[in-house]
């Protein structure tokens, strides 16, 4: 009787293993989709090759207190327009480095709450993504635009805010994928 039970249990285990393997083989690979409003993860790591952008190294309040130029980029991880804009944000970090405080901020925590003053990112958010706000060393808004803002426009606004010459953009194609942008950046 015990041998018969053991044989049945062994057959059942084999059947379950076979079924599990069959189910695993039918699951498709995970894929990030640039042109969908699906959540794929950190958009800067996936679509700009730069996961170091979030969370930002400093806060808006710290930037204002230290008199540094702050560049706020409002985005959502589950937004196709934010995904397409991610390489521009990464390029800003490459161009300006430590000369500015680059603050890519998800708008999720800002939804439906009151702004708490100049040091609160909700103060400057218009409700549309992506949105780029450049705040000068004196705390004044120098630039505020929504949508697929041209890199050259942001670059010029940062130059005005910092008083530093704008870095040359070369021949970077803002509409390309991050791999194309990275290739063009390294080719210059």
Model-derived segments and their meaning:
Residues 29-59:
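N-terminal "domain-start" segment that seeds a small globular fold
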Residues 64-66, 97, 124-128:
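Extracellular/periplasmic catalytic domains that process cell-envelope and extracellular macromolecules
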């Amino acid at each position: 009787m015990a041998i018969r039970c053991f044989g049945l249990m062994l057959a059942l285990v084999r059947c379950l293993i076979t079924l599990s393997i069959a189910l695993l083989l039918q699951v498709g690979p995970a894929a990030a989709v640039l042109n969908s409003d699906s959540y794929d993860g950190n958009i800067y790591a996936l679509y700009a090759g730069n996961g170091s952008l979030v969370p930002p190294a400093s806060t808006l309040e710290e930037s204002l207190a230290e008199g540094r130029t702050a560049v706020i980029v409002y985005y959502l991880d589950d937004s196709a327009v934010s995904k397409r804009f991610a390489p521009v944000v990464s390029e800003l970090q490459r161009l300006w480095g430590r000369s500015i405080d680059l603050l890519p901020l998800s708008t999720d925590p800002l939804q439906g709450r009151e702004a708490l003053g100049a040091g609160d990112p909700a103060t400057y958010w218009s409700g549309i993504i992506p949105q780029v706000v450049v705040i000068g060393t004196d705390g004044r808004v120098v630039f505020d635009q929504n949508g697929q803002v041209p890199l050259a426009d942001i670059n010029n606004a940062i130059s005005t805010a910092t008083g530093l010459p704008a870095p040359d953009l070369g021949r970077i194609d803002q509409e390309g994928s991050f791999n194309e942008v990275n290739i063009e950046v390294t080719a210059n």
